[in-house]
């Protein structure tokens, strides 16, 4: 496979603003540096399901990531592509679980102070996991009864404390980081792709 050309400053600016062409997304996926923290996970055959459906079915084992979810890929890629000055001020996110853990472990890896806002209704096991993955660099704030409440509180804190918000979705760098899962499937199974979900 031919290596993608490096992005120019203009390409990167356009990408960061969410106005990128599909080929720029592909370039960002192929050059994402998520493997500083994420694992290259297995693609395991699902033999029983394959027999039942009459097709070859495999499972991408993202449950083998350090936070048991693909969400670490997007969180880390976003933080790796955030200017150092913004990271130095600290980051904040809102999440009920997997993205929160991804930001926490990424903050610990990068030595960044992070505030993680989770709903008060989040399972205690998720809150404990966020604290464990983040260690002393992470502060967990419980706010509201829903993700929407936690998100609103995180936005308020971000504005008041000049923190950089790390979104869980709808961000080009988060999407590209999470897209690295697909690039691994492509490498693992180059000739047998009919449907991916």
Question: Residues of each region from the PLM?
Answer:
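PLP-dependent amino-acid enzyme catalytic core
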Residues: 1-188, 192
């Amino acid at each position: 496979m031919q290596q993608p050309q490096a992005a120019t400053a203009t390409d990167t600016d356009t990408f960061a603003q969410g106005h990128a062409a599909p080929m720029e997304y592909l370039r960002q996926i192929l050059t994402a540096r998520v493997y500083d923290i994420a694992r290259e996970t297995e693609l395991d055959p699902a033999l029983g399901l394959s027999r039942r459906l009459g097709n070859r079915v495999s499972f991408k084992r993202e449950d083998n990531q350090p936070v048991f979810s693909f969400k670490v890929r997007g969180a880390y890629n976003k933080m790796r592509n955030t200017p150092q000055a913004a990271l130095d001020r600290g980051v904040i996110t809102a999440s009920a679980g997997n993205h929160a853990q991804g930001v926490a472990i990424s903050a610990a890896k990068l030595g960044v102070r992070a505030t993680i806002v989770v709903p008060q209704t989040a399972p205690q096991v998720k809150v404990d996991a966020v604290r464990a993955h983040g260690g002393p660099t992470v502060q967990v704030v419980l706010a509201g009864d829903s993700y929407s409440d936690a998100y609103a509180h995180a936005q308020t804190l971000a504005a008041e404390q000049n923190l950089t918000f790390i979104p869980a979705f709808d961000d080009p760098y988060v999407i590209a980081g999470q897209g690295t899962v697909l690039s691994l499937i492509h490498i693992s199974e180059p000739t047998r792709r009919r449907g991916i979900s």
